[in-house]
Amino acid sequence: MSTELFNVADIFGENVFNDTVMQERLPKKVYKNLRKTIEEGKDLDLETADVIAHEMKEWAIEKGATHYTHWFLPLTGVTAEKHDSFISAPLPNGKVLMTFSGKELIKGEPDASSFPSGGLRATFEARGYTAWDCTSPAFVRQDAGGATLCIPTAFCSYTGEALDQKTPLLRSMEAINKEALRLLRLFGNTTSKKVTPSVGAEQEYFLVDAEKFEERKDLIYTGRTLFGAMPPKGQELDDHYFGTIRQRIASFMRDVNIQLWKVGVPAKTQHNEVAPAQHELAPIYTEANIAVDQNQLTMQTLKRVACQHGLKCLLHEKPFAGVNGSGKHDNWSITTDDGINLLDPGKTPHENTQFLLVLACILKAVNKHADLLRESAADPGNDHRLGANEAPPAIISIFLGEQLEDVVDQLISTGEATHSLNGGKLDTGVSTLPELSKDATDRNRTSPFAFTGNKFEFRMVGSRDSIANPNIVLNTIVAEAFADACDILEKADDFDLAVHDLIKEYLTDNQRIIFNGNGYSDEWVAEAERRGLPNIKSMVEAIPAITTDKAVELFERFSVFTKAELESRAEIQYEAYAKAINIEARTMIDMASKQFLPAFIKYTKTLADTVNAVKAAGVDASVQTETLKEVSALMAETKAALDNLVKTTADAAAKEEGEVQATYYHTEVVPAMDALRAPVDKLEMIVDKEAWPMQSYGDLIFEV
């Protein structure tokens, strides 16, 4: 384990072409033009781009870079990149020059035909464009392949449709910026020039030994275990959560931090999570589009560094049954360029009219578009988490906490809030411990969308998913609520009276979305149904939300998605679900046919030989006989379930692609998979460990 000392401040951002580097290297005029583009969206002329490209190239070469790539996030959900070297055509003397033009910086042309488009373009229509997102800084990534200049970009088709997640995210950020500024102007704010959603993503993950990982085909092919009985101990003692970090894991975390700090990712918090072998990394918040890029970098770094330590990083939402899965809490707030957090209630929120209007608008947005918010977290792996007493339920609700709920209740009942509850002081009863300031409200870990002091925490997002989609939805639905409020208030004769009436109206009309209780309880499921809140339990049931008339009207109004782009994304998600379940089913078939059944057959022969030997010795063989009967019965159940899964999977493959096929995989193939797993997991508790064909749960999660 490396123990070399270093100063974080010295290495932080050393491989980022950030504002400090640009100020040092770019001519003053060029730097000012670029800042105008970043801050005000002004066009960047090619002459300026040429200068930036040259300096960026020179800087990258000094860092050892030989190639550059337009780094983008297509609809596969993972980043994509094509590497080009800086060399030009060889000169007559056989030498080469290292070149990089403004045109190469601003635009790239990857082949778009092999990326998901959901019917937006035919396979033969191959041209696509990447466009430089200058608001997210370029960086040099150093790995086994050398050093590469990575330029964050958006990705679109030849005809302009978004083929990525960055483009609609940037559109949604522009929408909320415009509408939030309208709202601020109503309150007399003339100084703020820009409003930006600020995001921080808490990343959960598992680590397992690489050699043990390689023995599990299910982990290799699907990222999760498809078979596996629980060991005698799981997470019931709560001794792993915040426990002492093992030396091997601590060494891994140290190297992850170093790699992230060098590329400007402000990794802040690390700890053991609830499940054995589960951990979390959380950064400091930043602008939404940068946070999306940094989270993708974080996931890549976790995987890459794990391999260097003889580990494998599992980002699947549910790699192991019986213990908690992994999520990604998306912490979201709205801040101005001059430091105002629109979600900061202050010490007396009942007097903070601007905050109360923002809060009322968010309640309206989430209540109206709960289905869209749920869909933004839809993922095949997340189907195993949501509503399973380890993650938020699949029902969208908002937790406000005691203080804000009290203010809301006052406003709804009387139209006026006269006081705010305070947290006060916490006396521990120990004279040597300091008196602590108590927060005005507790936390609620069971809520999918919780207010946590000066931000909202959306807890539904899956651990391996990009945070782009949830933030696209959040930005857009809140922009709509702001716009609706501004349309009313800008026409009001008496602003103060109108804004108080509007706050009361929004709070009253959307009160059903507020729930401060236990989201894991059956009582809440029943109560949510009485309130008319949607309970969307699966990805397949969630997808239709993005193509409703309501969704199309919303996204087209703010130019975030066209109807065609929404329909294409729905098609892509149905296809992704079907493919994911198909791969899982085929993997189960392969493992059952080639590993489990052969192992069971050998074991029954061993048992049968033992029974015969014991009987021949003239002693009681009832225990051996009973075990043989039990194993044989479960083996027969396994074979019948395997045959059924083979047939069901073949039937699914023959279905019409899209919603029909995805629905069949969900309703027929998934239950058939569960039916195959059940007898195999029972047999794992009976069969001799030496005869078991792969690493057990105990081996994987306790021997790291």
PLM regions: where:
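Composition- and surface-driven signal marking solvent-exposed, interaction-prone regions
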Residues: I220, N295, E317-K318, D344-T348, ...
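C-terminal amphipathic alpha-helical interaction region
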Residues: T508-V704
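Short linear, low-complexity motifs centered on an aromatic residue
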Residues: G77-N93, P110-S113, G118, R216, ...
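Hydrophobic/aromatic-rich, well-ordered segments within soluble, folded domains that form packed cores
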Residues: A65, T69-W71, Q294-Q308, I334, ...
